[in-house]
Amino acid sequence: MLFLHDVWVNWFEGEENGYNVCHFHEWRKEDTVELLDQVPLLRVPSVLFHYIENDLSELPKGLLEDVHQKSYIRKNHERTKLEYCFVVTDGIGILAVDTIGYTIPVRKSRLIPRQEQLVYEMVKDVEPETYEFEPKKLESSKEYHILSLAPEHVRGLTRKERQIKQLMFMALDQLKGLKNRAEIGYWYTEWNPHMYEQIKRMSFEEIWDMLYNETIEGWSDKHLAFCENLIKGQPFFEKLWEMENESKVN
């Protein structure tokens, strides 16, 4: 088995979408970065790598057995054993995983560029490890939705833009649940004032579909202003907004 040593990790907890596990250039100074003293390195087929990266489902039993208690974290000069922690790659993507004792990939992190390069060098002549696993699970019937946006809807966005776009759709999802024709009409007019007359004859569902389809694509200053207005007066959303806007970088 291959091992890496002195690996810096920035854990993102409970992330089912790989695009929210930020690469090194998007790490922030307020993130908590930890040092793995030792961690197993596994090369797996791409289908398994993407399953681990983009899901929070059960890991193969054989994989868990292979990495059991073979990782150590260093904190305050103390070396502590971890139950199930490993770095996994398909030769293209790289991900550190810690299950915090469970059997699903609860915490995920990217590596720093120097250590990514080391991973590529270490696995270039290594055959992917195959684990007994249900193929249908590997293919993952995961469905994206308004609270878990498809990768194409956040591609090219910075960490801050992704977070604010996801916040906007949390607020829109709440708006959808109210099923208030007057309110959805108001917010659609805020987004697209030129349609003020046309939407007077439309149903809630028709207006909602237009608002969703027009806001889901891309990101712009218009999206930003719309989100800021949409969340006003809602303490939970306002707190999330403030947290993102206190971070000037990324």
From Swiss-Prot:
This is UPF0736 protein YjbA. Belongs to the UPF0736 family. It comes from the Bacteria. It holds the Pfam family DUF3603. InterPro entries: UPF0736.
